[in-house]
Amino acid sequence: MPKLVTWMNNQRVGELTKLANGAHTFKYAPEWLASRYARPLSLSLPLQRGNITSDAVFNFFDNLLPDSPIVRDRIVKRYHAKSRQPFDLLSEIGRDSVGAVTLIPEDETVTHPIMAWEKLTEARLEEVLTAYKADIPLGMIREENDFRISVAGAQEKTALLRIGNDWCIPKGITPTTHIIKLPIGEIRQPNATLDLSQSVDNEYYCLLLAKELGLNVPDAEIIKAGNVRALAVERFDRRWNAERTVLLRLPQEDMCQTFGLPSSVKYESDGGPGIARIMAFLMGSSEALKDRYDFMKFQVFQWLIGATDGHAKNFSVFIQAGGSYRLTPFYDIISAFPVLGGTGIHISDLKLAMGLNASKGKKTAIDKIYPRHFLATAKVLRFPEVQMHEILSDFARMIPAALDNVKTSLPTDFPENVVTAVESNVLRLHGRLSREYGSK
């Protein structure tokens, strides 16, 4: 039976096996179980001897891959993979995945921990960033057969290595340092066309605003190559060693992986985890008080900026030695406000991915949410009322200045319509806070 050897930073963790019937099983290596660095590959796959055969195995590895069937088909075509199944796709592109996971076919020799890369010219960078237009997945152009990465999510993206001021393609199993996100473009729905051609600017703005308001988010920059405009987001699951000679991968997983769920239920409305389940899980965090506070603070931020995609795959935890865990920075933040009107959608259509508690059921419609719904949710969760008041009060006080500070920091060619759309709607919702908490 074919096997993929699973590594974490030069340590052999175990083996993923695909059975004759297509089922996926995983077994931890004895040396990993005995290691002082030992930790579970996923919190849904506890350290144990023997084969793990639960659905969590398939779901964990499947969640390392792009969500889009179209992108998966491109991977099959590009590398002649046997199928869309996680084992077959990761056999081809599992060298650099989300978190610390590296997957290598058992018959391949691996040399650790050599760092190797190829510097990209601007023309080559543009070729990588536009590869998806030629049905090439994740920027893995044909001339770079050694460049094999897996980046989860629904958006067109790739990952690159930054060395000094140069963008580089990593060689072998050298890690990447940045996720590179391309414009989403138009999304056609039955009753609307969502123009997300400025998604790069949108996300950059939202990340700046989040940071200005004290939220833990990754650094990002807008990069250009030829006619391409992309967002380079620094990976928080990577860290240089003290000598800056080796780039380490940091173990992490998203909430679908944590709970052993498939990506098809990442939304609460589809049966996925909501605020209550995640807040209960964060009670076990090594930084429980901080993580629960930050998570609730981020829920308010998502409401204020009209972020409708805060599903389970957009929240993650670092997995530490022994299996302890803590919340990662927040990521994949984009506002729906710029797509309102015209051929887009109406404000009444915007809904949070995770509902808040109301007098009757759950409240998700952004334009129908008020501070009282966060307080009601906090009460149900036994999150201290005084802390929820503090979060709401801080946003009431900080929003106006934060918006001004972000605006003055934007590049001169930044699209004004993105700023206007987000800012005007944030201020409108902020009014609901300032009426109760003041804005001084």
From Swiss-Prot:
ATP binds at residues 152-157, 181, 234-236, 311-314, 331-332. Once phosphorylated no longer has kinase activity. The active site is at 309 (proton acceptor). Residues 379-382 bind DNA. CDD domains: HipA_Ec_like (cd17808). Keywords: Antibiotic resistance, ATP-binding, DNA-binding, Kinase, Nucleotide-binding, Phosphoprotein, Repressor, Serine/threonine-protein kinase, Toxin-antitoxin system, Transferase. It comes from the Bacteria. Autophosphorylates intermolecularly on Ser-150; phosphorylated form not seen to bind ATP and no longer has kinase activity. Pfam families: Couple_hipA (PF13657), HipA_C (PF07804). Disruption phenotype: A hipA or a hipB-hipA operon deletion have no visible phenotype. Initially cells lacking hipA or the hipBA operon were thought not to produce persister cells at a high frequency; this was later shown to be a strain-specific phenotype. A hipA or a hipB-hipA operon deletion show decreased biofilm production in the absence of antibiotics. GO terms for molecular function: ATP binding; DNA-binding transcription repressor activity; magnesium ion binding; protein serine kinase activity; protein serine/threonine kinase activity; sequence-specific DNA binding; transcription cis-regulatory region binding. It catalyses: L-seryl-[protein] + ATP = O-phospho-L-seryl-[protein] + ADP + H(+); L-threonyl-[protein] + ATP = O-phospho-L-threonyl-[protein] + ADP + H(+). GO terms for cellular component: cytosol; protein-DNA complex; toxin-antitoxin complex. The modification Phosphoserine is found at residue 150. Toxic component of a type II toxin-antitoxin (TA) system, first identified by mutations that increase production of persister cells, a fraction of cells that are phenotypic variants not killed by antibiotics, which lead to multidrug tolerance. Persistence may be ultimately due to global remodeling of the persister cell's ribosomes. Phosphorylates Glu-tRNA-ligase (AC P04805, gltX, on 'Ser-239') in vivo. Phosphorylation of GltX prevents it from being charged, leading to an increase in uncharged tRNA(Glu). Forms a HipA(2)HipB(2) heterotetramer which can interact with a single operator on DNA. When 2 operators are present each HipB dimer contacts 1 HipA molecule, which are brought together by the DNA bend and dimerize, blocking the HipA active site and inactivating its toxic activity. Mutations present in allele hipA7 (G22S and D291A) decrease the affinity of HipA for HipB. This is Serine/threonine-protein kinase toxin HipA. It comes from Escherichia coli (strain K12).
